[in-house]
A protein has these predicted regions:
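A short N-terminal helical cap/helix-turn-helix that marks the beginning
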Residues: 13-31, 51-75
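A non-catalytic, amphipathic alpha-helix used as a structural packing/dimerization or gating element
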Residues: 7, 11-18, 91-98
Length: 114
């Protein structure tokens, strides 16, 4: 194990709130969290409970907004079927939007878990 990896890992174990606060700086937040970890109801811990983010935005829109829309976002390479495909951020966002629309048509609403 590399020395750097070991240092990062140890910090994540010994100082989890400090570690994840630093990591959270690399994520786009609509509302930045002030509470990193709530341990009041173990083992049901709550992370970033007062923050608001969106995984899809961080995975796709953020990169498109920063000029990477035509760059490859996903490479599909199936060892079973030998099918291969590449998707740009723009293409992937279009497919995700269509799927989100299908879920909405099935009654899924904001805040639901799918």
């Amino acid at each position: 194990m590399s020395k750097k990896f070991e240092q990062i890992y140890n910090k994540s174990i010994t100082k989890p709130e400090e570690f994840w606060r630093e990591i959270s700086e690399d994520i786009f937040w609509f509302k930045k969290p002030t509470k990193i970890l709530n341990k009041s109801n173990p083992p049901f811990y709550k992370w970033f409970e007062d923050g608001t983010t969106n995984t899809c935005y961080n995975a796709l829109d953020f990169h498109i907004d920063n000029g990477l829309g035509e760059k490859t976002a996903l490479i599909y390479d199936s060892p079973i079927t030998s099918n291969k495909a590449k998707f740009t951020y723009n293409e992937l966002k279009s497919k995700v939007s269509k799927f989100a629309g299908a879920l909405k048509n099935q009654g899924l609403q904001k805040g639901d878990r799918a």
